[in-house]
């Protein structure tokens, strides 16, 4: 397949929103930049005739929010976001998310360590954990 055909096919898939975007995956630890990643479970009251779509739209329009998913289980939505500090994430939950009329409750989970993200292994396996070496 020649390069022009690949470029044309990619452009067509972008126009048809088959390819929705491109993302850069950054290891913030290696970059020396502190980031706090949170996964927030949200229980909401769905709107008549709109279901969860309207409240999900309100949430995903906040610039801090990276992703919003409709989920099964005890909560309805999963919201992921990154902040500079725990306080910044807490402020978002307290002042923006929990104040929405449809939001009944939230449960915030902080990411302590990323092992794999978007299909990419984020740990350096060449450095064995000391506990493994002792075994």
Indicate where each model-derived feature is located.
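A compositional/biophysical signature of low hydrophobicity enriched in polar/charged and small residues
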Residues: 1-135
């Amino acid at each position: 397949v020649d390069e022009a055909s690949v470029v044309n096919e990619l452009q067509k898939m972008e126009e048809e929103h088959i390819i929705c975007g491109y993302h850069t995956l950054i290891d913030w630890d290696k970059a020396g930049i502190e980031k706090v990643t949170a996964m927030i479970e949200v229980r909401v009251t769905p709107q008549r005739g709109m279901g969860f779509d309207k409240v999900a739209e309100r949430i995903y329009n906040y610039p801090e929010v990276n992703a919003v998913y409709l989920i099964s289980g005890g909560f309805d939505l999963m919201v992921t976001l990154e902040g500079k500090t725990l306080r910044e994430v807490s402020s978002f939950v307290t002042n923006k998310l929990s104040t929405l009329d449809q939001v009944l409750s939230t449960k915030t989970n902080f990411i302590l360590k990323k092992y794999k993200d978007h299909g990419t292994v984020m740990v350096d396996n060449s450095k064995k954990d000391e506990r493994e070496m002792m075994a």
